[in-house]
Every structure is written in structure tokens, then in C-alpha cells.
Amino acid sequence: MQLFGVKVSAFYRFCSIIPARLSNFAANYIILYMIDTTIFQNKKAVYYTLGCKLNFAETSTVGKMLKEAGVRTVRPGEKADICIVNTCSVTEVADKKCRQAIHRLVKNHPGAFVVVMGCYAQLKPEQVADIEGVDLVLGAEQKGDLMKYLGNLEKHAHGEAVTTAVKDIRTFVPSCSRGDRTRYFLKVQDGCDYFCSYCTIPFARGRSRNGKIADLVEQARQVAEEGGKEIVLTGVNIGDFGKTTGETFFSLVQALDKVEGIERYRISSIEPNLLTDEIIAFVAQSKRFMPHFHIPLQSGCDEVLKLMRRRYDTQLFASKVHTIKSYMPDAFIGVDVIVGTRGETPEYFEKAYEFIQGLDVTQLHVFSYSERPGTQALKIDYVVSPEDKHVRSQRLLVLSEEKTHAFYARHIGQEATVLVEHAKAGMPMHGFTPNYIRVELEQDEALDNQMVRVRLGDFNADGTALQGTLM
């Protein structure tokens, strides 16, 4: 029997790809783009993801779709029929890594149908399509419609690019990934309306948009049913949640907190001006949301923050750190910092360094500024040399190590609950405390994905974790 020219069995199989109660977008493309999935039977795919956790979540969704259509992931040594590359374009180095990854996959999997998606694909689709071996380039609006564009998997003489103007990118594609770790990454928001002077992400991912709270809660319940215990909320600008649904990030946090079976939530990264005292107070009293924050600072100098077109100053940032610590003295606070941006004079850097040095934060994620075409930052005259960028970066990395070491050392001798993660071959068993201290444990596969009480001992050999003893 056929329905709209498609085998009914294939139609039902394709319907099963989409979890219940997801977005209208998902429901619509089932109806509009029903396909005969028998062309995917016995096919093998390889997936390569670059960049942020959001990308990994989206790749996982693509993988689930292909798996339900009959495609399995390649095993070591096998050749793939389909190569999926999810790209990043946050820096010039990221662009280069994307090209290298594509070349490597084309070489290692001759004859495979190569699909490239992600930020680099949206920003430079024709450049990506020109890479030898690439068959299909999908923009931000199209990647959720992968099944529609795969066709019959025949190689193209030249790559086909299908993208949408950034102003027309409006679809929210639900995504959730597990990967090799115990924790899951749940995409709650996409896109950004901030247009900072140095950043191309709004041009790569479009305007801010989000899923519905009811749908996201349902995804969290599904994670719990699969045995998942920890979820990290991910997005481009998650504090801006609610633009498309009239809801708020605080309401989302409250709703997720009620999902039974999930032991831990972490907020991946949230802008300081969107991290409200209300959210901080809620996390402090919640048994499920962990005392762990990641807040992008980018610069500790107000003059540079203005050049960056950031929406806060150092006084506001310091007040957020103070509020967190007043509620949760042992909270882990990670901070993003960019060094060497245009306009960052030696005096401005020293001012920033002094401010960061005085902050009660745990870890710095240090990035060297990379010039991106089309950004407003290129209009700023003062340029920092690569040598100075390196020196400044190293100083902040040393400062970060000092802060992290002091934070860990303060907890030696204490008891804590650790969620044990799956150990990679040849690596020690490890897990994390509620406030994100990495703890190494004696090898015991029975502990995988288990919550255990440990006593925190001294540092491990390389100083990257504390040694834990089971209570």
C-alpha cells in the first residue's frame, strides 16, 4: 500500500524518527517530505562535529534520524556511505579545521555522499561546496530537513549549496545528545540578537528562537527514561529564552526542576545581564540545579566592553559573581575571556587583568581574538600583534590555573557526591561533584552512571583532578 506515492511502511518508519510533542516544524516536515527510507537500508554513516556542545546535540539528532531510517554508524576500519560534517566558524582557525576535516573524510571514505552543515556552511556555502568531494551543503534553516535533501545518495559533480538568508532563519530544531559521557546536552535555544562587534554567530545561526517549555520538559523526561541523570542546558544565548514562545528562562528552569529521575542540571553559559538574581536564588535552593555557572565576561575593561558592544559593564559582572557567592560560597564559576581584540591597548589589558585577578571565579576559558569578515570590530584602528596576543593569553591561562588549583585545594578532605562518567579505554574512572570538581576513582565499571559518596583526597599526578575514595 502507498500513501502520497510513498510506501506506508516507510512512512511509519519515518514518523518514528520524531519524538512525540516536539515542534510544529517536526510534524510539518513529516507530512511534507515523506520519503521511502528503503534507500538507506544497510548504509553506514560517519559523523564529525566541530565546535560547541550545541553542534554536538544537533549532530546527535541527525544521527538518530538516519539510524531510524536504517543507517548505522561505521565501526573502526569500515568505509562510510554517508559522511556528515557539522562545522564551526567562531574563528579563522575553526574554518581551517573544518576544511581539514572535510578533506580527511573525503580521503578516508572514497565514494561516500558528503554533507556539510553548521556555522561555516551557513556563512560560506559556496566556498564549502567548492571543496572536492562535497555533495551537499545545508544552511541553518535546512539542516533539520536533512532527509529531504539527501535524495538518492548519488555523488554530485559539484557540491550543491542550499541556504537561507539570515533574516529568514526562524526554525528551531529540537536536539539532545549524550555522546560518550553520562551527561546529556539539551538544546533549549538557538540564534542570537546581540550582534557583538567581533562575532559572526548571529549571521551563522540567525535570530534568537527557542523551543516550547512543554516540549523541552518532555525531552527531559525521555532522558530520564533512558537512564540519564544529568542534563546540560545548551544554546547560543540561553538567557534570551522565550523570544518565540512568550515564556522565560526562569519558567523553563522551574519546569525542568520538577522532572523526576533527573538528578542534575547545569546551565551551560548565560550572559551576565540575563543571569537574574531570581535565577541565582532558585539554583541555590534547588536540589537538581547544580552550583555551577559559566558566564562570558570577554573583557575586564569597560572601554573594551563598549568596543565589543557588550550589554554590561564590569560593575554588573562583579555584582553577579558576588550574588552567586553570597548564596553559594562553593559554587564553580567559569568565565570566558577574549584577549587581543581590536582596541585592547596594553593599558586596557592591564586594567582587565587586574579586574579578573580580583574576581572570585574558578576558571578562565581564554580565547585569542580572531578577525572575522563582516564584523564591526574591523572598523577599530588599534590592532594587537599575534605576539602580544600570545603573551596576554599565557598570563591569563596561568591565572586560571592558580584560581582552579586554589578552588580544588579548598575542598580536599571534604565529602561529596560524584556522578561517575563512562571511562574511555586506558583512562581512569572519573566523575564530577555538584560544583564541577573533577574526581578520579579506582576503576570499577559497575560505577558507570552511578551517584557515589566519596572523600576528596589530594591532586592526581598532573593536577587536573582530585583523587576520590569511596565512602
Language model segments and positions:
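Cationic, low-complexity basic patches in intrinsically disordered or flexible, solvent-exposed regions
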Residues: L3
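Terminal RNA-binding accessory module
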Residues: V46, K379-M471
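Hydrophobic, well-ordered secondary-structure elements that form the walls
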Residues: I295, D336, I356, L364, ...
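Conserved SAM/AdoMet-binding glycine-rich loop
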Residues: V114-V115, L123-K124, E225-E347, Q357
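Proteins enriched for Cys/Gly/acidic motifs involved in redox and nucleic-acid/cofactor modification
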Residues: Y33-D240, E278, F293, Q315-S326, ...
